[in-house]
Amino acid sequence: SFFVLHLCVCHKQDKNMNSKELQLLVRCGETSTVQFKERFSNQDSIAAEMVAMSNARGGMILFGIKDKTGEVVGLSYQEIQQINSMLANVATNLLRPVIYIQTETVIIEDRSILVAHIDEGDNKPYKDLSGVIWTKQGADKRKVMENSEIVRLFQCSGMMYADEQPIPFTSDKDINSSV
């Protein structure tokens, strides 16, 4: 239906999601803004995902959902508390600049799912502690390697403007003041 398509493609991150919305997102599968994680298993992988989302359009990581099948497995209360703590640690200590995330727990199929909301960043480019800049490519993440992409991220953040950049091999004598 239109509602399902609209939600899958254009879900706004209003940070409050009900179980019906979450079920529809899970049915739509992973996208560039929605990622599934059964558990918090590797902090470097989660850090890379958070960096990629911050450098792109933002997104959500849904914990308690199998990433290959979309099966809802859920989390215990203790797992939710532990993952919340680990997410805060990653966002504060493993990313540069620091990002701020919001989390919420949503119940679907009588199972608790932790939803971590990651906003598009204002201070791009974001990177992990190794200095790697990640971005989204469809549902996957990839390293940013090209200088032009890095420049674009700076420009998107408003930290660099083309008309303020030096032009190599020029001087003030090259300026045409009659224009």
Predicted regions and their residues:
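Conserved N-terminal catalytic/coupling substructures associated with nucleotide/phosphate chemistry
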Residues: 2-179
